[in-house]
């Protein structure tokens, strides 16, 4: 999926759209997506001047956005049809290495289960094949108003 297709499944827009493309998708199982991290990201102005590092919370948000695409595609819905999938919880978040300008952040999410509209996933973020962050994520669908 290219950026135009990604934008059909995520309501986020610049500067909070954190998925640039989807490289692998297995419906009902897993997704691999990419965020190209550039020095032009607005958060680098303050995190940290002279030693820019992508905030860990945004790495988690990028994983959650990839997981949201997986859920929408698995159910064959879009946000315009049914609503938005909200990030609802996180467990066991671990940050292993910093993500810096110029890195290509590879986002991986796998569905653990979906029960009564609550999705649980495992998420990983990698740079150059090395683990930089991991977490268990939860999300839920909020109906369209």
UniProtKB/Swiss-Prot annotation:
<keyword id="KW-0441">Lipid A biosynthesis</keyword>
<dbReference type="GO" id="GO:0005737">
    <property type="term" value="C:cytoplasm"/>
</dbReference>
<dbReference type="GO" id="GO:0009245">
    <property type="term" value="P:lipid A biosynthetic process"/>
</dbReference>
<keyword id="KW-0456">Lyase</keyword>
<keyword id="KW-0444">Lipid biosynthesis</keyword>
<dbReference type="Pfam" id="PF07977">
    <property type="entry name" value="FabA"/>
</dbReference>
<dbReference type="GO" id="GO:0019171">
    <property type="term" value="F:(3R)-hydroxyacyl-[acyl-carrier-protein] dehydratase activity"/>
</dbReference>
<dbReference type="InterPro" id="IPR013114">
    <property type="entry name" value="FabA_FabZ"/>
</dbReference>
<comment type="similarity">
    <text>Belongs to the thioester dehydratase family. FabZ subfamily.</text>
</comment>
<keyword id="KW-0443">Lipid metabolism</keyword>
<dbReference type="InterPro" id="IPR029069">
    <property type="entry name" value="HotDog_dom_sf"/>
</dbReference>
<dbReference type="InterPro" id="IPR010084">
    <property type="entry name" value="FabZ"/>
</dbReference>
<dbReference type="GO" id="GO:0016020">
    <property type="term" value="C:membrane"/>
</dbReference>
<feature type="active site">
    <location>
        <position position="47"/>
    </location>
</feature>
<comment type="function">
    <text>Involved in unsaturated fatty acids biosynthesis. Catalyzes the dehydration of short chain beta-hydroxyacyl-ACPs and long chain saturated and unsaturated beta-hydroxyacyl-ACPs.</text>
</comment>
<protein>
    <recommendedName>
        <fullName>3-hydroxyacyl-[acyl-carrier-protein] dehydratase FabZ</fullName>
        <ecNumber>4.2.1.59</ecNumber>
    </recommendedName>
</protein>
<keyword id="KW-0963">Cytoplasm</keyword>
<dbReference type="GO" id="GO:0006633">
    <property type="term" value="P:fatty acid biosynthetic process"/>
</dbReference>
């Amino acid at each position: 999926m290219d950026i135009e297709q990604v934008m059909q499944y995520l309501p986020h827009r610049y500067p909070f759209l954190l998925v640039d493309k989807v490289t692998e998708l297995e419906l009902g199982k897993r997704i691999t997506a990419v965020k190209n991290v550039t020095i032009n990201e607005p958060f680098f102005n303050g995190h940290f001047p002279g030693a820019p590092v992508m905030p860990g919370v945004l790495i988690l948000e990028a994983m959650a956005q990839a997981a949201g695409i997986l859920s929408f595609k698995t159910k064959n819905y879009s946000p315009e049809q049914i609503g938005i999938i909200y990030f609802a919880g996180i467990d066991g978040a671990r940050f292993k290495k910093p993500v810096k300008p110029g890195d290509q952040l590879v986002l991986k999410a796998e569905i653990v289960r979906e029960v009564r509209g609550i999705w649980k996933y495992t998420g990983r973020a990698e740079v150059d094949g090395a683990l930089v962050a991991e977490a268990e994520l939860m999300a839920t669908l909020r109906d369209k108003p």
